[in-house]
């Protein structure tokens, strides 16, 4: 029988007027176990798979919440929260705000409980997430701006309608639902040394870290944010809650300006470190998951893998679980991410070469590239650039290559043949 651990957080809420000004937040291990019981038959116990090729000096395992029902972990917290509502709260209907994954979790949970739901989403949310939320039964209200703007609109609608608000992360029952992942990790890999978790508002890492630290305090728990949305990173660095003026990341699922009050306190208490990863590092992680593990991850879902791949944490030689939190990525974004990842790994490049505008030049360039093992995928002549003489042109050429070394060999061979490389462009 699990030992019940009770933690109290007195939180002053600034903007959630529809909740009490001072809240007694109770997150218990028993509540997480109860959430696991409630979620049986609803949320999958997702696989933990070994991924030895992602980081050769670390024993990496992937917790595949991207294969969860609705495509992300969010259904755990949303379903458990809604299951615990009173009949009166259910009768008022449900309102939520989300960049996409919480929206789908709320929609599924509300529909299964026979409750009308409205979800406010930023108008820049991926189309796939918006459409999936509608298919799962929710009414979607698109709001111009970011997640925080969608949140503000949800507050307004809650005031107008009296609906029950389901917060995406700053709620003890939502946190308990997400914490069931921590229980599963310890069950699937008892001798785990560290767990790396994505952070947006902090609900996922709060639940996971609480569960893991309660059962095995020796396991390290690390959080990762996108460098373009480092709200929790900044807050933990300065030991007080901070709000970003703006966010800039394609990892829309963790593009949050302000972490939760509850979650910030829990991260401060239970998380060993928070780090950030760049957009290019996230793109490289997504590409690695596709190629090496045959897994599709969204940007937010890949940040833990990015942190491991690019040595952001002291995990060499350790058994480490990277939580792949979601796989709901828009195919257009995925295409751009793959292209960026190929460029980063030296397998795609664009060269611009200054040529004399006469027959045979393109053939000679192509032969040099072929001799070096490169593959030409696109060619464009630019005769209109005013920086060139009338008798010259720019040749913009796209290549498929093996790696950065081969790109250097091609450039050197072209230079040796007398061609002038103006620049290399992505």
Kindly label every feature range from the protein language model.
Residues 23-426:
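PLP-dependent amino-acid enzyme catalytic core
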Residues 4-7, 15-17, 21:
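Intrinsic-disorder-associated, low-complexity terminal segments enriched in Asp/Asn/His/Tyr and depleted
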């Amino acid at each position: 029988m699990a030992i019940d651990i009770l933690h109290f957080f007195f939180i002053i809420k600034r903007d959630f007027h529809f909740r009490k000004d001072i809240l007694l937040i109770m997150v218990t291990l028993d509540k997480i176990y109860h959430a696991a019981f409630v979620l049986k038959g609803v949320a999958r116990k997702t696989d933990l798979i070994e991924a030895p090729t992602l980081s050769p000096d670390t024993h990496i395992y992937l917790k595949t919440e991207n294969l969860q029902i609705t495509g992300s972990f969010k259904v755990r917290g949303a379903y458990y929260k809604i299951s615990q509502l009173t009949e009166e709260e259910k009768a008022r209907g449900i309102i939520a705000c989300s960049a996409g994954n919480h929206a789908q979790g709320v929609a599924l949970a509300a529909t299964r409980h026979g409750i009308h739901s409205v979800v406010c989403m930023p108008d820049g949310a991926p189309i796939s997430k918006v459409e999936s939320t509608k298919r799962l039964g929710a009414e979607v209200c698109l709001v111009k701006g970011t997640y925080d703007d969608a949140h503000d609109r949800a507050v307004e609608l809650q005031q107008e309608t009296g609906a029950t608000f389901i917060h995406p992360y700053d709620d003890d029952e939502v946190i308990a639902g997400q914490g069931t992942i921590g229980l599963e990790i310890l069950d699937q890999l008892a001798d785990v040394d560290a767990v790396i978790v994505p952070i947006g508002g902090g609900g996922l890492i709060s639940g996971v870290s609480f569960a893991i630290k309660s059962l095995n305090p020796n396991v390290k728990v690390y959080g990762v944010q996108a460098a373009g949305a480092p709200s929790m990173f900044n807050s933990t660095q300065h030991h007080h809650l901070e709000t970003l003026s703006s966010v800039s990341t394609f990892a829309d699922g963790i593009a949050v300006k302000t972490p939760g009050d509850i979650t910030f306190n829990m991260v401060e208490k239970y998380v060993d470190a928070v780090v950030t990863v760049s957009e290019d590092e996230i793109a490289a992680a997504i590409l690695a998951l596709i190629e090496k593990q045959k897994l599709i991850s969204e940007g937010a879902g890949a940040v833990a893998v990015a942190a491991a791949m690019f040595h952001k944490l002291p995990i060499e030689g350790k058994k480490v679980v990277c939580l792949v939190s979601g796989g709901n990525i828009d195919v257009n974004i995925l295409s751009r991410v793959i292209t960026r990842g190929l460029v980063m790994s030296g397998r795609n490049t664009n060269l611009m070469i200054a040529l004399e505008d006469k027959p045979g030049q393109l053939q000679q360039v192509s032969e040099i590239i072929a001799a070096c093992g490169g593959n030409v995928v696109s060619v464009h002549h630019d005769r209109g650039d005013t920086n060139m003489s009338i008798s010259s042109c720019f040749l913009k050429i796209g290549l498929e290559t093996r790696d950065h070394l081969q790109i250097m060999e091609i450039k050197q061979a072209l230079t040796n043949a007398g061609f002038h490389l103006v620049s290399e462009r992505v």
